Regions:
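Walker A/P-loop
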Residues: 22-43
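Conserved pre-motif I regulatory segment
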Residues: 1-29
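Conserved helix/coil segment N-terminal to the catalytic DExD/H
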Residues: 81-110, 124, 128, 467
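Conserved C-terminal RecA-like helicase domain
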Residues: 31-34, 38, 55, 62, ...
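Post-DEXD/H (motif II) to motif III coupling segment of the RecA-like Helicase ATP-binding lobe
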Residues: 124-183
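Long, largely alpha-helical accessory region at the distal end of helicase-like NTP-driven motors
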Residues: 216-267, 528-743, 750-760, 764
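A short beta-strand element within the Helicase C-terminal
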Residues: 462, 467-485, 509-513
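Conserved segment of the helicase C-terminal RecA-like domain
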Residues: 498-529
């Protein structure tokens, strides 16, 4: 019998993992405060193999050893990697330092279970070493524990991470822990700070220059002449093998030539496998321009156009950089960012008074401003201190902490820091004392400062992200202001986690994100904010658009469609007002939590017009209201064209949803047949005039697998092994069911059992490539595009 008594949510995870205990890898996501160490030890006990536990810090190493000694005092523990015991605990850094001595270390010492604590750190070069060691120890089993999987890592980093940790098997959600009163509820707010007119001008000039370059690329006589001389253009039937193997390049050439008034010969239509009058050739897109010039740069880099691109910075060090990102001059916007922080602090101070326990975090210290350097365009810990100490009320206690120094008020110094007087340094900081931090006193000074914040003797603490990292904990924090740069999803979650510990009844933490906004630019095209919003969309929280719901997704931030100066100011002002309503938001969390028991992961499929489509609107009504428009109203308002167009769209959408429903049911039935799902796991499908949704209620691993298969089946068509055709529509046969023809036939049989008539095509031969081309062309000429999004909803 285990010596550890688990909480309900921990027991749920252990129960769900029972069927995975023999897998090569187990991967658990759990927020700070959920007891990842306890979960890890429970699994170590169940696995019963010689174990190596790797952690990213000495602090966590000590924590693991203390937990083991408390619950299992009889277990033999080693801290020496090269002299392992039944349980060995060490750091990733130490493992890496001994890499030359570890060639067959796991096999030679019989290590069978590897625990990777805080596994999100494995984006670093440690992962390459561990992957190599894991491949040599074929019997090795891994357990990855993390609060913050690197969801926004690039494709290569994420691939390496998953190769080592395996796919996520189970997740303990923040909402579960709030429901169990282990963590405190919170509310995320975005403060929109419009950039300066100078920055707006720079961005406008960037967009204008980009448009000029694109216009230049879309019509180049030398490019036209070169393409017309190629055999795959003037004799395509002789070059079908080249065309089918390089279809993206071929298609981009055709789209380009079409805009030069080139008339496609019958041979091209034969290669494309469609009749001339059955398709309207689409315009060039960003992707087609990239495909075209990447192809040309490979075969004729001497073209004059590439000298032009080099001058414009779109070709650098022999690499094309088409559509480069806007190089942001953050310095010009520093005064507005500082003003935003000051505004938030003053408001939160007025709302909470002495109950304020706020942490303001930056990336940089900028200590030189304490010595008198002009701070107007400096952004960091020290400049924020100098401005805020003049703004806050006399009774608000302010402190600053970073790796180099601590600043506290004279009153706090006299009552709590007299024993550290030897570290005092003379600085002209009226009313405040500067203490130098050293390796000798750092941990003590930080611990005492944290204690004073926890007890409200300090109300506002300014610090660096690097010092107040994932090991820092102060339960009393009720306001977090993220003054740092956008950072990664991992860093964002770690910072947010500083404010989620419970510290009494009805605590709710306000978490502020500051975003520089370019007025009149769509949200998705914002140079700075788009990346921040993407990270925030992964985070669950209260969605107050209608009734209170806990969900992920950008919708919960209720951002305005039009980001002009007026709406930017109104949005921010509304957030500042709502930040006052802590008690109301606490009750809304309670209401939302009562509506469910777990965080489900439904998929939502929506059709949206492509960006190039022109939206027709009349003064009488907009398309948003077309559901309420009947035939007589349409006639009276002169909108019959839109009425019939919308009616046709809805009819087509409902037919498509009926097919989707049967395809989803097919996948569900196949997973039942394989034993991946059980009959007790329900499938829920729903749709309306604008969206289609589906979900199963199962373990994280099962839900994720199901969603991935649906996305593969219904998503965008790239280069699948097998294609599925139902009437005129094409779908991808998921890789799980397209390893060979036998697997495909099983998939096809399951589809026919749902009452659908379907054909399949192997895309690696000529006839299959033709079908793939048709599928891609259908997608290109479609007026709408499908968005498939996974959201998490408490239900």
């Amino acid at each position: 019998m285990s010596a550890i008594k688990l909480r309900a949510y921990q027991q749920r995870v252990i129960d769900q993992l029972a069927s995975y205990l023999d897998n090569d890898s187990i991967h658990i996501v759990a927020p700070p405060g959920s007891g990842k160490t306890i979960l890890g030890m429970t699994l170590v006990e169940k696995i019963q193999r010689k174990t190596l536990i790797l952690v990213p810090s000495i602090l966590l190493k000590k924590q693991w050893i203390e937990v083991i000694q408390h619950y299992y005092p009889q277990w033999e523990i080693s801290e020496e990697l090269l002299q392992p015991a039944n349980i060995t605990v060490t750091t990733y850094q130490y493992l890496y330092s001994k890499r030359k001595e570890l060639d067959n270390h796991f096999t030679e010492h019989g290590i069978g279970f590897l625990v990777l604590d805080e596994s999100h750190h494995l984006k670093k070069n440690w992962s390459d070493l561990l992957l190599d060691l894991k491949e040599k120890a074929t019997e090795l089993q891994t357990l990855a524990l993390t609060a913050t999987p690197p969801f926004d890592a690039n494709q290569k980093e994420w691939g390496n991470y998953i190769r080592l940790t395996g796919a996520i098997d189970e997740e303990i959600t923040v909402s579960e822990l709030i429901n169990e009163a282990v963590l405190a509820p919170y509310q995320d707010y975005v403060y929109l700070a419009p950039v300066t007119k100078e920055s707006q001008k720079q961005f406008t000039e960037f967009l204008n220059e980009q448009n000029q370059i694109v216009s230049h690329l879309c019509s180049q006589p030398e490019v036209t002449d070169y393409l017309l001389a190629q055999e795959f253009i003037h004799q395509p039937l002789n070059q079908t093998e080249f065309i089918y193997q390089n279809f993206d390049s071929y298609l981009s050439c055709l789209l380009y030539l079409n805009e030069q008034q080139y008339q496609f010969s019958d041979d091209h239509w034969q290669v494309l496998g469609i009749k001339r009058n059955k398709i309207k050739i689409p315009q060039q897109t960003r992707k087609s321009i990239i495909d075209l010039y990447q192809y040309l740069f490979q075969v004729v880099p001497q073209l004059e156009i590439f000298r032009y691109l080099s001058k414009k910075g779109w070709l650098y060090e022999d690499k094309l950089r088409l559509f480069p990102d806007f190089e942001i001059n953050n310095q010009a916007n520093i005064p507005l960012m500082k003003e935003a922080i000051e505004h938030i602090v003053v408001k939160e101070e007025s709302y909470l008074g002495n109950e304020l326990r706020c942490v303001l975090l930056f990336d940089y210290i900028k200590q030189e401003v304490l010595a008198g350097k002009e701070d107007y365009l400096e952004y960091g810990v020290a400049p924020a201190f100098l401005s805020l100490k003049e703004l806050i009320r006399p009774e608000t206690s302010l402190a600053v902490v970073c790796g180099e120094f601590l600043i506290v008020s004279q009153k706090i110094f006299q009552t709590h820091f007299q024993t550290y007087a030897e570290f005092r340094r003379e600085k002209k900081l009226a009313g405040y004392i500067y203490l130098a931090m050293t390796d000798k006193n750092r941990s003590e000074l930080l611990a005492l400062t944290t204690q004073l914040l926890d007890s409200s003797e300090i109300n506002l603490l300014i610090g660096t992200v690097s010092l107040l990292d994932e090991g820092w904990n102060c339960p009393a924090v009720n306001t977090i202001i993220m003054g740092n740069a956008a950072g990664s999803y991992v860093q964002t979650q770690q910072i947010r986690g500083r404010g989620l510990r419970c510290s009494g009844d009805e605590k709710l933490t306000n978490i502020w994100h500051i975003a520089s906004i370019y007025p009149n630019i769509p949200v998705t095209e914002q140079p700075l904010f788009a990346a921040i919003l993407k990270r925030l969309s992964f985070i669950e929280g209260l969605n107050l658009m209608d009734e209170p719901v806990i969900s992920t997704g950008r919708e919960r931030f209720e951002l305005p469609d039009i980001l002009d100066l007026r709406t930017i100011a109104g949005y921010t002002q509304n957030n500042l007002y709502r930040a006052k309503e802590r008690k109301q938001h606490f009750m809304l969390w309670e209401t939302a939590l009562k509506q469910g028991t777990h965080l489900a992961m439904p998929l939502f499929i929506r059709s949206r017009p492509k960006e190039t489509e022109v939206h027709l609107e009349s003064n009488a009504f907009k398309l948003d209201n077309v559901d309420q428009l009947n035939l007589i109203q349409a006639f009276l308002q002169g909108a019959l064209n839109i009425y019939f167009k919308e009616r046709k769209r809805k009819k087509h959408w409902h037919k498509a949803c009926q097919v989707r429903q049967k395809l989803v049911q097919t996948l569900y039935q196949l997973l039942l047949n394989e034993g991946v799902l059980s009959e007790s796991i329900p499938l829920v499908i729903d749709w309306n005039n604008h969206s289609f949704s589906c979900e199963i209620v199962a373990s994280y691993h099962q839900e994720k697998l199901f969603n991935e298969l649906i996305c593969e089946l219904l998503g965008e068509i790239h280069s699948p092994r097998y294609l599925l055709k139902i009437k005129q529509d094409y779908f991808v046969i998921p890789g799980r069911y397209s390893k060979n023809k036998k697997a495909v036939l099983i998939f096809l049989t399951a589809i026919k059992q749902q009452g659908l008539t379907a054909d399949f095509f192997y895309t690696k031969n000529i006839s299959g490539r033709k079908q793939l081309i048709k599928a891609r062309l259908n997608s290109l000429q479609a007026s709408d595009t499908l968005d498939i999004n996974e959201r998490k909803i408490w239900q």
